């Protein structure tokens, strides 16, 4: 006697995609707990994590990407160039920057996560470009090309060097900056501040010193609008 097989109902693709996204974001945040040890693994004398009292949300050399004539507030973002969530947030941040950049100072700080093999190297490349006045150009290049180099397990430093060449940088100066302990310490300082301030994943935003927990772009925009008054 034959038996009739009951066909299972196909999974909802949208629901499955949402589940994958939340799992991915959860993994990104969880990975932040071990960032410091991995990033300083190859440094003979690791930089000690600063106590909270010494942490600074904004330093003199922090990258200010807007410079309002009259500042109403500061939005600080700790980011990782290999982080998919950071890339997804970038168009939102760009839109808010265009809307509020004349009143809010937008500030970027490095926070490469250890789960991303090339995020620290990407930060070095961006900082090296910044030393030649091309911070924003290299910043944009990293996110534009993330799908090309993100999640690779081999070093992408040669690719990043081609980006420097495309941007017209002095390659000798770029190479020296990437290899410089001063450049590496510049990034480690951002990481140490972030950890001391409670950053465990990316992107993490602080508005006027307050760490934000955001549920929607509308909420994000409203917080900036309130600060910009």
Model feature map: region roles:
Residues 113-202, 206-229:
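Cysteine-centric redox/oxidoreductase cores and disulfide-bonded domains
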Residues 2-114, 188-191, 226-229:
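Extracytoplasmic thiol/disulfide redox context detector
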